[in-house]
């Protein structure tokens, strides 16, 4: 399923780590490293599983939008 089709779903849906990685164009390993360092969107730990709320992933991406390179 394409990222565009996934993003049209319920924003409060908890998504898999692999789905979050696909939406953010990152590897699952990168998300794992980010969790250790406290970077990245908030996540939910349910048993051994890690989940992300779709809307929080999108909000996290939107918060990093830059108008030009000097803003970084």
Question: What are the language-model segments listed below?
Answer:
Residues 1-13, 70:
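A detector for short, charged/polar N-terminal pre-domain segments
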Residues 17, 22-58, 63-67:
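Major-groove DNA-recognition helix of helix-turn-helix-type DNA-binding domains
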């Amino acid at each position: 399923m394409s990222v565009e089709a996934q993003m049209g779903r319920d924003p409060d849906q908890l998504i898999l780590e692999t789905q979050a990685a696909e939406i953010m164009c990152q590897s699952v390993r990168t998300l794992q490293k980010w969790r250790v360092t406290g970077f990245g969107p908030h996540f939910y730990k349910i048993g051994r599983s890690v989940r992300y709320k779709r809307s929080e992933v999108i909000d996290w991406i939107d918060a990093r939008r830059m108008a030009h390179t000097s803003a970084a």
